[in-house]
Amino acid sequence: MFTPLSSVTALLALSSAFLGAQAGCKPKNYGPEKPHGGNGGNRGSGNGNSTSKFIAKGYYTGWNSDDFKPEQVSWSKYTQLAYAFGIPTDSANFNLSLDASNAESLDPFVTAAHEHGVQVTLSVGGWTGSLHLSYAVANAQNRTTFVKTLVDFVVKHKLDGLDVDWQSPNKLGLPCNAINANDTANLLLFLQELRKDPVGAKMILSATGNIVPWTDANGNPSADVSAFGKVLDHVTPLLYDVWGSWSDSVGPNSPLNDTCAAPDKQQGSVVSAVAKWNKAGIPLEKIVLGVGAYGHAFSVNKTKAYVNGTKELAAYPPFNKDIHPKGDKWDDPAGVDPCGVATPDGGIFTFWGLIEHGYLNEDGSPKRPYRFDNCSRTAYAYNEEEQVMVSFDDAQAFKEKGAFIKSQGLGGFSVWNAGSDHKDILLDAIRSGAGLSK
């Protein structure tokens, strides 16, 4: 039986002590009755109580599979990979589409993973693929239909489970997403029904969240999500995109801590998110920390990029919101989102993109003006010629997040995404910090 920490303060105190120290430093195929267990010791428990094995997880983006093929995955360093994304295509039958994710790549990927003893889940939804999720769980009939759709898909493709990537129940993500005040309650009913299915009872079942627990019927972060912990094998708070082009200034993509920042710069962090999810009833060992192997680019004038009279990069400098820097070749180009709204270039640099574009050296060390922020424990790099600043996690940031995972007894990590690293610099760093071998 899980008993949450008595207060957020308890976890924050432990975390502060940790941060102070850091500052100084071939499975078989299966039929409907029995899901495949690529790494049997970490198979879903059927009641959400599988906590015995550290989870080293990564997302595999199907739309990038031509650039990042299964044979390029460092299989021995992962226990799970989530194939992104399966998208419900309508508000009636909730059929899944992988049209945007190279559907033909899924089965070969699953085969390759299982040959290496690694489990594969399908990530359902995503930021641009959650338009119909509210409908899919809105009533008993829809939930039953959606459960059947998902179970049939899992069986057909020999998957080990599902990752529900609905980041904003009862909270507007894309402007055309369906929302309902009862989204979070309905999501729980759906997950409970999925667990009652003979296949669903045995699969890995996880869900993503943000820096606060899912939104309740009153529009506030839920105070009690302990029932989710009974049906899910793990919850992954996505601790990235905390700052970006929507923010008032440049800021850390994934702050480890922000209690040392000015109050108006405290937008949430790894430390605060873990404390809030735990206080709301998710056991620490069921929290798998979502980390990002990429950074956000901002247009920052040279007169604002440095501390006055120095070559030290400034903290939280203003940026030009009218200029949207292009990222690397995996960046989302300017276009139209699923709602028909025009969108600019995404300004995203993968870790290898930072090397390819000259922000970092081949070994991940700084090549351009650089700052490691002692508060957020994240990195910044600046291209003076193009006047672009990028906030991101470097190897030190990943190592410290790994150490935090270990110190707090979390369930593991989940990196977005497996193909964004360079020569496993980040993957090795977080594994090292968590006490795992390279």
Curated annotation (Swiss-Prot):
One of its GO terms (cellular component) is extracellular region. Transmembrane segments: none annotated. It is found in: Secreted. In plants, chitin acts as a microbe-associated molecular pattern (MAMP) that is recognized by lysin motif (LysM)-containing plant cell surface-localized pattern recognition receptors (PRRs) that activate a plethora of downstream immune responses. It comes from Moniliophthora perniciosa (Witches'-broom disease fungus). The gene is Chi. Pfam families: Glyco_hydro_18 (PF00704). This is chitinase-like effector. Belongs to the glycosyl hydrolase 18 family. GO terms for biological process: carbohydrate metabolic process; chitin catabolic process; effector-mediated suppression of host pattern-triggered immunity signaling. GO terms for molecular function: chitin binding; PAMP receptor decoy activity. Catalytically impaired chitinase that binds efficiently to chitin, but not to chitosan, xylan, or cellulose. Despite the lack of chitinolytic activity, retains substrate binding specificity and acts as an effector to prevent chitin-triggered immunity by sequestering immunogenic chitin fragments. Does not function in the protection of fungal cell wall against plant hydrolytic enzymes. Chitin binds at W416.
